[in-house]
Regions:
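Acidic/polar loop patches that form or flank catalytic/metal-binding clefts of enzymes
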Residues: 69, 294, 398
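Nucleotide-sugar-dependent glycosyltransferase catalytic domains
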Residues: 41, 52-261, 268, 273-279, ...
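Cofactor-binding loop segments of dinucleotide-utilizing enzymes, especially the Rossmann-like FAD-
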Residues: 23, 51, 142, 234, ...
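General beta-strand structural signal in soluble alpha/beta enzymes
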Residues: 48, 119, 294-295, 330
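Nucleotide-activated sugar donor-binding and catalytic core shared by glycosyltransferases
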Residues: 7-9, 16-49, 53-65, 88, ...
Length: 427
């Protein structure tokens, strides 16, 4: 058992300190802030090491913010937007480390005194800092990384040996990235070199706690996984997220002037592909005449012309706007996808990355939306997007989306995760 920070008790629980390391977008940070709020409610300490861009979000939940000296958009460009192969990812991680030589020192300082270190794929360097300080770890994934026959990022099939085989190169790929990016640091602090046979699934002879903060409806856990791998449900409280948002009069007028619109949002990552996708989607909306509210961060002022069919908007709380629309079109990010499904909305995913395409496939598989489009796998044309939009609003997905909404609302991801953390750390 790892020693706890203090003997202060709340009921039967022993107080602990957890440090999460997050590199990525709001979708990577917000679930951790929600989990942190739950852990603090239970009497534990929770802190998040991440970009300055997320300070306000984190501190609004009462969670301790620790600054990681990196720019969130810059990180996303190297580790997500430009990521097409494992080698690209390794190059991005290596370049990021080269441009931010204090990464590991910052991480070591942030996690000292912790009882558990949590990290996602883009922050896998935190695992090595935790190993150096002999602190247990928890991995956080938003798409399947543990082998299963049921589904895979790398196969369009389901429930087959081919699906299971698609995972074969994944551990070696992660090890290769690590060898390129971190073996120099590991040797400098006296840790053994990471090898191609090394695995992230265990540390110091113990299996690493693993979380998938997504719905079991979309991603049923493989019974063969066992402990300590958990598909928990989403980590957020959507009913609290709208806050004191005041609807602009122009939006109120648009909503009241015709049929319920769809909501279109593709995130903020800087990418030529994203800019092209937004323009194609606008052309498809104009061609079909479908009313839409469009959150467009890469559309120029010249193109942002409100009409009786299109309304452009910047930041807006998703739980709020999802109550006002009939369907949603987005890039397939785990949190955005979950919020839309929880709201009972038919969903069309036009993905920029493989994990997003996976969730689009899952949405389609459970009957909540059309087959997804993937800008890197198919030549996304105006015709393809227009056809998918018309299918989305045809009504064929409405009843199933409402059924799935009820199932997702029965899950409580933050409570499930918090219970698992307390059990794991106390063992």
């Amino acid at each position: 058992m790892h020693p706890v920070v203090s003997e202060k008790r709340q009921g039967e629980r022993v107080s602990m300190i957890i440090t999460a390391v997050a590199v990525g977008t709001r979708g990577d940070v917000n679930p951790l802030a929600e989990l942190g709020e739950e852990m603090i409610r239970r009497g534990h300490g929770f802190r998040i090491l991440t970009s300055e861009a997320f300070r306000t979000l984190i501190e609004s939940k009462g969670v301790t913010f620790i600054k990681l000296d990196t720019d969130a958009d810059h990180v996303m460009k190297y580790l997500v937007t430009d990521y097409k192969t494992s080698l690209d990812f390794a190059k991005g991680m290596f370049r990021l480390k080269k441009e931010n030589p204090g990464f590991m020192e910052q991480t070591l300082n942030a996690i000292k005194g912790s009882d558990l270190v949590m990290y996602g794929t883009c922050a896998a360097f935190a695992r090595h800092a935790a190993e150096y300080l002999n602190i247990p770890c928890a991995r956080i994934f938003y798409s399947p990384m543990d082998p299963t026959r049921q589904y895979s990022l790398y196969s369009d099939e389901y429930d087959s040996d081919k699906v299971l085989k698609s995972y074969d190169g994944l551990p070696q790929g992660m090890s290769l990235m690590t060898m390129i990016a971190l073996n120099g640091w590991r040797c400098s602090v006296g840790l053994p070199r990471w090898r191609i046979s090394s695995r992230y699934t265990e540390m110091n002879g113990r299996k690493v706690l693993t979380f998938y903060p997504t719905s079991k409806v979309l991603m049923p856990p493989d019974p063969a996984w066992g402990d300590p791998i958990h598909v928990t449900g989403y980590w957020y409280h959507p009913e609290e997220a709208a806050g004191d948002y005041e609807e602009p009069k122009e939006l109120t007028d648009f909503l009241g002037s015709g049929k319920k619109p769809v909501f279109v949002a593709f995130g903020k990552a800087e990418s030529p592909e994203l800019a092209r996708l937004q323009l194609l989607t606008l052309d498809a909306l104009k061609r079909t005449g479908i009313r839409a509210i469009v959150q467009a961060f890469q559309i120029t002022e010249k193109e942002r012309v409100n009409t009786d069919k299109l309304f452009f908007i910047d930041a807006v709380p998703y739980p709020y706007i999802f109550e006002k629309v009939r369907a949603v079109v987005h890039h397939g990010g785990n949190t955005t996808n979950g919020m839309g499904l929880r709201a009972g909305l038919p969903t069309l995913v036009i993905a920029l990355a493989l994990d997003q395409y996976f969730y689009g496939r899952m949405d389609n598989r459970i009957g909540c939306g059309p087959e997804p489009l993937y800008i890197r796998k198919k030549l996304c044309s105006t015709d393809e997007i227009a056809g998918a939009l018309e299918d989305l609003v045809s009504g064929r997905y409405d009843a199933k989306a409402r059924d799935i909404s009820r199932m997702i609302r029965e899950e409580n991801g933050v409570v499930t995760a918090a219970d698992s953390i307390e059990k794991y750390v106390s063992e």
